[in-house]
Amino acid sequence: MSKVMVTGSAGGVGKAITHKPIQNGHEVRGFDRAINTREDGADGSDILDYRAVLKAASGQDVIIHLAAEPDEADFLDKLIEPNVRGLYNVCDAARQQGVPKLILASTVQLIAGHPKDAFVRLEDGARPINHYALTKLWAEGMGEMYARAYGLSVIAARLGWLPRSREHAEELRDSGWGTNVYLSHNDAARFFLKCVEVEMEPARFEIIFASSKAKKLRLDPEPAKRILDYEAEDIWPEGQPFI
């Protein structure tokens, strides 16, 4: 049993995944500006409050960092504070408190500059096309540095398109390509549980795509299978509650 802190636990991804480690006997501590009435116990804390993050990180075995501005937005007004400073606060609190494992939410938008029908492997590299994706490239770089320099075990999860609302699901459906990078709520929960439970040696850093099945698969599933023993079960529109 592990103690697992989840930042952004009341957000779209957080609400989809927090139940799974609880069901498997882990102790989950939610951390979100919104007070979540679910079992994860988010209490209105903000990742921009370093002291609050530091206090919450004490005694944790794993931190899943989801809290962020979740879409493209004005870089100076909307993205820098949560996606850059907030990320630093979480990573540095993990270091200060001796949290051995850090799981960082990255994004499929990092490969948006590749052709829309291309099968993308990690070695093909990141090709962001907006500032939101750039903040997630920063997150991957920070995760690698904290693993190498400070000995944390770090997974950067390049998350597929997980619908956060009915409108978001309809946008995915109508996009012409979103179903090929779809990540269901159910598969996301299974993926993050695998991340929590996998044994990793100190100072190890991995980038892993997280997606569901697709008629035309775009994201290489091999790292998730090899590192986590994760295999997707759903295909669009399975595993999401909206449409």
Where are the regions a protein language model picked out?
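Conserved beta-loop-beta element that borders a ligand/cofactor-binding pocket
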Residues: 140-165
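Conserved C-terminal active-site "lid" loop/helix of NAD(P)H-dependent oxidoreductases
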Residues: 170-172, 204-231
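NAD(P)H-binding glycine-rich loop region in Rossmannoid oxidoreductase-like domains
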Residues: 47-82
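Alpha-helical substrate-binding/gating segment
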Residues: 161-168, 182-204
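Active-site helix of classical SDR
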Residues: 124, 131-138
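Conserved Rossmann-fold NAD(P)-dependent oxidoreductase catalytic core, especially the SDR/UDP-sugar
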Residues: 89-129
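N-terminal Rossmann NAD(P)H-binding glycine-rich loop of SDR-like oxidoreductase domains
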Residues: 4-23
